[in-house]
């Protein structure tokens, strides 16, 4: 064991989530292995028994049995399984005779590790960027607006009269993007602007937080940040009094 792992922190995270359904899913599995052939990781590994979905969620039952008294090496095993051996596609659940939502259990373990400060570095950085700037790429408001204006100028050379309205109140559609677009792929924004222009659509983009429609916080089950990201978008939509939010991600 190691003092670096706090059993109380583990149990404090799990206990509020241990409702009747959670307990049923953890306890009811009969290890029938009907989920095995539904898992692409299992099939791609040459049918390694450790890749069977039911086996992957054994950690939860173990954590509860040990009351969180595990070492860092054990947490590393959990990390490797929940991030590199499962992408939560839910195919296994469709074939489970008890309907055990293995993806939910995997997500719960991701949330647990996130609460302990353990998550892929790229995702951790993106989540911090959301908190600081409202988007995963840490694009400032000034850079975002400047990029939109540049996209309008470039695209209008091909479609005469093309405009990319910013903060147009009462527009029908508020368009949101993947934050990688203004950072690396502004041409994607131009192509959409051309479509809207030719279609004669009434649209706008927000200048403030809410224009990034990605939500990488979901992948590490950081529920608070995931909620903040969604709320940013809908808050801006309400402020601009638009009728629809278009999300391409």
Language-model features: locations:
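Iron-sulfur-cluster electron-transfer modules
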Residues: 16-17, 23, 61-248
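Ferredoxin-type iron-sulfur electron-transfer modules and their immediate structural context
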Residues: 1-85
């Amino acid at each position: 064991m190691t003092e670096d792992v706090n059993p109380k922190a583990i149990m404090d995270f799990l206990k509020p989530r241990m409702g009747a359904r959670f307990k049923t899913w953890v306890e009811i599995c009969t290890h029938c292995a009907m989920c095995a052939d539904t898992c692409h990781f299992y099939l791609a590994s040459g049918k390694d028994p450790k890749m069977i979905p039911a086996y992957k969620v054994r950690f939860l039952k173990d954590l509860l049995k040990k009351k969180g008294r595990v070492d860092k090496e054990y947490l590393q095993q959990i990390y490797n399984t929940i991030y590199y051996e499962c992408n939560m596609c839910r195919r296994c659940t469709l074939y489970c005779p008890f309907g055990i939502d293995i993806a939910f259990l995997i997500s719960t373990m991701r949330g647990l590790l996130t609460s302990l400060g353990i998550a892929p570095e790229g995702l951790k950085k993106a989540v911090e960027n959301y908190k600081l700037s409202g988007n995963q790429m840490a694009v400032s408001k000034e850079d975002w607006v400047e990029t939109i204006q540049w996209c309008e100028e470039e695209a209008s050379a091909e479609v005469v009269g093309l405009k990319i309205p910013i903060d147009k109140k009462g527009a029908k559609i508020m368009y949101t993007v993947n934050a990688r677009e203004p950072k690396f792929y502004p041409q994607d924004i131009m192509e959409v602007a051309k479509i809207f222009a030719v279609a004669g659509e009434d649209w706008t983009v927000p200048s403030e937080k809410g224009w990034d429609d990605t939500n990488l916080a979901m992948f590490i089950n950081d529920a608070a940040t995931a909620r903040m990201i969604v709320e940013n978008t809908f808050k801006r939509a309400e402020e601009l009094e638009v009728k629809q939010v278009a999300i391409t991600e």
